[in-house]
Amino acid sequence: MIAWLDPQDPFPPVEHALGPDSEAPGLLAASRELSPQRLLLAYRQGIFPWYSSGQPVLWWSTDPRMVLAPPALRVSVNLRKTLRRVLRDADWEIRVDHDFLAVMRACASTPREGQDGTWITDAIIAAYGALHRNGLAHSVESWYRGERVGGLYGVALGRMFFGESMFAHRTDASKIALAALCAFLGNHGVAMIDCQQETDHLASLGARPIPRAEFVAHVRAATAQPAISPWRFDKSVLERWAGTPAAPAA
């Protein structure tokens, strides 16, 4: 049995989440409300929302938790070649927070293997949009010849980044954005990106599962640190992975 949360109710301890032998491992609570304030409380405790349209808001704290250390991003030979091409080619850009809501909508409309529909509902878009307006959620976008072709978004609290979703309309476009994000976060002392749930795709990028207790302890410490400011970078951060200087701007 999981807790039902009224607006004033705190989250139960994450240890109360359903266990690995249940039908929904990691499910902790449900609510009708999805406010920016509730989201911030959740993230600082290692909890995230994930639900489908027509369901109540479902809150999760999975054990183990999938995380990516920015320096551990796995850059394949082919991706490294792509990053070098991006650095040389003026048609490629990395833009930060250019159109956060458009990135969310692109993530929502991208088909996912094994998923019908999307969990990025209108309520999710509204709540994360409010966080973005307050400087707490960010998008990293890959642009090619003036068109957004890939990107990702997530929540940034202190020195912790909580990844939410990504999309690509061109080969490796989301990985380009992720490589830029990892380089930027690594430069600012961020040790861990939350990837939430274990998938083969995340593992192929260098993410690994860690015990929930270890994750929650790290989140508490990292979110108490000063926030990164400003969130401003371009594709030159990709030099970390490509080993090639970016071409000078025309």
UniProtKB/Swiss-Prot annotation:
InterPro entries assigned to the protein according to its UniProt record, in alphabetical order: Acyl_CoA_acyltransferase, Leu/Phe-tRNA_Trfase, Leu/Phe-tRNA_Trfase_C, Leu/Phe-tRNA_Trfase_N
Pfam families, per the entry: Leu_Phe_trans
NCBIfam families referenced in this protein's UniProt entry, alphabetically: aat
GO biological process: protein catabolic process
Function according to Swiss-Prot or TrEMBL: Functions in the N-end rule pathway of protein degradation where it conjugates Leu, Phe and, less efficiently, Met from aminoacyl-tRNAs to the N-termini of proteins containing an N-terminal arginine or lysine.
EC number: 2.3.2.6
Protein name as catalogued: Leucyl/phenylalanyl-tRNA--protein transferase
Major subcellular site: cytoplasm
Organism: Cupriavidus taiwanensis (strain DSM 17343 / BCRC 17206 / CCUG 44338 / CIP 107171 / LMG 19424 / R1) (Ralstonia taiwanensis (strain LMG 19424))
Family: Belongs to the L/F-transferase family.
Enzyme class name: transferase
UniProt-annotated location(s): Cytoplasm
One function term, GO molecular function aspect: leucyl-tRNA--protein transferase activity
Reactions catalysed, as given in the entry: N-terminal L-lysyl-[protein] + L-leucyl-tRNA(Leu) = N-terminal L-leucyl-L-lysyl-[protein] + tRNA(Leu) + H(+); N-terminal L-arginyl-[protein] + L-leucyl-tRNA(Leu) = N-terminal L-leucyl-L-arginyl-[protein] + tRNA(Leu) + H(+); L-phenylalanyl-tRNA(Phe) + an N-terminal L-alpha-aminoacyl-[protein] = an N-terminal L-phenylalanyl-L-alpha-aminoacyl-[protein] + tRNA(Phe)
Keyword terms, alphabetized: Acyltransferase, Cytoplasm, Transferase
GO cellular component, one term: cytoplasm
